[in-house]
């Protein structure tokens, strides 16, 4: 029998499309979690493995007890029965854990499962496993990322042969069976599999799926990979809808229960775009499991691996180069590394807390969901428990969501279980928090909660807390270490008393005035204050319903920083409520200690200089190209990337650090920006360069994404050059120059 090249066969497509066109995926309001259901007591689980050191068995069992998790998934293959995984399985069962045993043939054996020889090996393996563990395990799963042939190795014929043998053996012993560990949300495979097994009268007891949403970055997002970005909001395939649809598919084919036997966020993938990967993994874990608990669809949900430096709850101390060739979601073969190097990630405490808070809880309903703000109401242990968070980078003041009386009566717990005792939080942000009240207390909301005025923060900025300010018609935010510093800062930088310096004493005085003041918290430092002083009439009309310039500057800087793009650290912003002039707002940030800006560097190169301050042309081009490419890859369209806004700190002649200022116009995406926006930024950045220099610079930039400079790439540069030429001659600058020339002539 020839081996099939892919699991996505014509029959899979036909079965799936027939189901979809028949309305199988129709689920009105399926993206919203249904109210009033109970989260199973044994809802939470994790994948485990051990190694040759039996002390690892003891360690992992101890960590599972700390987590409060009794449900584990363990992978077994042919050689494991006489190895450490078999020993570890016995230890888990003796310790009272409910084990889901995933049986996995070696890759080459799975590829040849259609042959009589391999079927005999598989049958012997099944019989041995069931004789040794069968009566003690909770359930057995057959299939490992079945729809990923390069990981599992199966053909459909081979899998159905393996399933039939396992089905007959397990049915004789009354052992529940799971099938077939489909990876991600790819319902064509679920439909084809269950349709085929129903026809064979071999349906599993439980449908299993690895319900990953890592590809959408955040657990709450609508999946942009289903019919792409512009349709994501229309079809609303978020995590809740995916879970509900998987349950529906199972029930349509006669299976009542569905489980997710593995999912995670790999830290290294998070850090491709965001800072603080381990902290973000912990955020995502809490948000993911809360949404699955709210969906009311899954019988169980497992985190992929307990011990792994990439995706585990515990860091094994290894480097990426030491990661096994086969993905651990396909086969978690062993806990690698040395026991003395194991260290819990923040996600460990996050898992411990969500297990404690939500196991067996009653889900009351969603107070806010799918709009960037998530608040979910549970009853647990005689308490109202609200799990609250915002999407990445966004924040909303608690006072805009709950009444003062409700907040005064609340107890607050961090994502990791620590109590907020001395200083309660001011904001709901991307890091989930738990708010609890006694069961009889009436929780009152200010209004229907939502993200109204845009507010961005870098939630994991070290040694930083955010305090919302409301003071005599002013509002804003300060970023300091504690409440005492916030009060000290407000005394020194009261917006009612902040006054800009005159033109001669300012760093800049044009549409905005920028000046320095002593840092209220550090007498040895200066900070920068920025305030609009001139608004053209059309801007007053167009910007009336936009956030203030100070808020936009704050948001832009915060979005850059959390993406790993340097900008002077924001300290505060203040805005006058109801200000029609649009000029009564202040943005305050650290003063940037730099050596020059790119406008000066490129100006020198354009004048024919071979170097500037000891910097060679190619060094500057290559390093600036990497900086801007990273910014674009991480989702920033800066829109004002002129040379004066790119600051340069010279570490040495071959090592430069760049940072960005004037951040109010920047726009941000969760994904890399398209080429036309990249070119729009680049036209401003290298406007001063002549075309030979531009070609060198653009060669570096485009080469980072495997491209070469083409003719159509040059068009935006010609258009921008023309725009600048016209602006200098017939625009505001041209008119100003003409007026000055006429004045001097007649005087």
Predicted segments with their positions:
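C-lobe/activation-segment region of protein kinase-like
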Residues: 656-739
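C-terminal beta-strand-rich structural cap/linker in extracellular carbohydrate-active enzymes
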Residues: 15, 20, 420-462
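Catalytic domains of carbohydrate-active enzymes, especially glycoside hydrolases
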Residues: 41-81, 87-91, 98-102
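Conserved ATP-binding subdomain of kinase catalytic cores across diverse folds
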Residues: 469, 474-599, 610, 626-634, ...
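Carbohydrate-binding surface patches
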Residues: 368-407
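Aromatic/acidic polysaccharide-binding cleft in carbohydrate-active enzymes
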Residues: 263-351, 365-371
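Hydrophobic residue at the +6 position relative to the catalytic HRD Asp in the kinase catalytic loop
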Residues: 641, 646-651
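Noncatalytic carbohydrate-binding groove/subsite architecture in carbohydrate-active enzymes
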Residues: 157-288
